[in-house]
Curated annotation (Swiss-Prot):
Coiled coil: none annotated. This is S-adenosylmethionine:tRNA ribosyltransferase-isomerase. The gene is queA. It comes from Nitrosomonas europaea (strain ATCC 19718 / CIP 103999 / KCTC 2705 / NBRC 14298). GO terms for cellular component: cytoplasm. Its EC number is 2.4.99.17. It is an enzyme of class 2 (transferase). The keyword Protease does not apply. It catalyses: 7-aminomethyl-7-carbaguanosine(34) in tRNA + S-adenosyl-L-methionine = epoxyqueuosine(34) in tRNA + adenine + L-methionine + 2 H(+). GO terms for molecular function: S-adenosylmethionine:tRNA ribosyltransferase-isomerase activity. Monomer.
Length: 353
């Protein structure tokens, strides 16, 4: 596991900004690729208003695009305690076929050994508690993944102020999702449809994959003022051999590596740090916390959405493009009514020198 990237002490307030509520996208657009896209040149601090459909114009034959193919599970469950009190369960991470780390919203803290009845069908026992996270054992013959698929609800982020609908089961999932395990979508990937993927392949851009199962910790706020005191959540990732080979070939030919989403970037950069600057196929876990001053070793460009104030993701993009460049970009996005967060618009960022 990794938790490095901070060069000097910075304050959470350095990453704060005011966002009008009406700019928080509550629904996806009619078509995935209808999103706007703000191009940000970190080298020259330039901005350019574009559309996501223009993405191929910024790429060339031999470049690679790295997508996170994790699949969002229906991680939200409602139920009652044995005493009758209501509970809301959000799976944070699946541990094995019957156990998971979860966040629980209830009127009072749960007691170790107590049981819950979820969705009127599933009995779960509280095995352990570590701060805000509980470990639940789901006492059912079906594996947990199948239980969630049958009885769970799409885990929309807390800033989307509505219940999930049947439509969200499709739209809060990328078209290339394969490996079940995430409890939040890798949202930069939501802009892609099959037409865009085929257009990029025809252009000669290589599309490759990593898997990083996004945890509920991605929504947790930074609660400390000095960011070097923040404890980053841990997420599992996997990098296939063909991805390593494609990136090595791209780099040797002078191409650029575009990471789609902060999760793809963190998987690649974590692997590089773990292996002394070498990209190695295999699985690992990361709690890499990237802030200004971090040296990016492999990713040249980043496609990402607009992130929450005071968040670790905003700190990451500030490291990638430069703090002043990102402040300028976010002011521009707000002034020009870009849509923010999971169902919002995109940024394409060229890294700073």
């Amino acid at each position: 596991m990794l938790a490095i990237g901070i060069i000097r002490s910075m304050k959470t307030d350095d990453f704060d900004f005011h966002l009008p509520d009406e700019l928080i996208a509550q629904f996806p657009l009619a078509n995935r690729s209808d999103s706007r896209m703000l191009y940000v040149n970190g080298k020259h601090a330039d901005l350019r208003d574009a559309a996501f459909r223009n993405l191929p114009d910024y790429l060339k034959r031999g470049d690679v695009i790295v997508l996170n193919n994790t699949r969002v599970v229906k991680a939200r469950l409602s139920g009652v305690k044995s005493t009758g009190g209501k509970v809301e369960v959000m799976v944070e991470r699946i541990l094995d076929t019957h156990r998971a780390r979860v966040l629980i919203r209830a009127s009072h803290a749960l007691v170790i050994g107590s049981t819950l009845l979820l969705e009127n069908k599933i009995t779960a026992q509280v095995e352990a508690r570590e701060q805000d996270i509980y470990t639940l054992c789901f006492m059912h013959s079906l594996p947990l993944i199948e239980l969630l698929d049958q009885f769970g609800h799409t885990p929309l982020p807390p800033y989307i102020g509505r219940n999930a609908t049947v439509s969200d089961e499709n739209r809060y999932q990328t078209v290339f999702a394969q490996e079940s395990g995430a409890v939040a979508a890798p949202t930069a990937g939501l802009h892609f449809d099959e037409t865009m993927l085929q257009t990029l392949r025809t252009l000669g851009v290589k599309i490759i994959y990593v898997t990083l199962h996004v945890g509920a910790g991605t929504f947790q706020p930074v609660r400390v003022q000095n960011i070097d005191q923040h404890v980053m959540h841990t997420e599992p990732y996997h990098i296939p051999t063909e991805t390593v080979e494609a990136i090595q070939m791209c780099k040797s030919a002078g191409g650029s590596v575009l990471a789609v989403g902060t999760t793809s970037l963190r998987a690649l950069e974590s692997c590089m740090l773990t292996n002394d600057g070498t990209l190695v196929a295999g699985a690992g876990e990361t709690n890499l916390f990237i802030t200004p001053g971090f040296r990016f070793r492999i990713v040249d460009r980043l496609l990402t959405n607009f992130h929450l104030p005071r968040s670790t993701l905003l700190m990451l993009v500030s490291a990638f493009a430069g703090m002043e460049t990102i402040r300028h970009a976010y002011r521009h996005a707000i002034d020009n009514h870009y849509r923010f967060f999971s169902y919002g618009d995109a940024m394409l960022i060229d890294s700073q020198p």
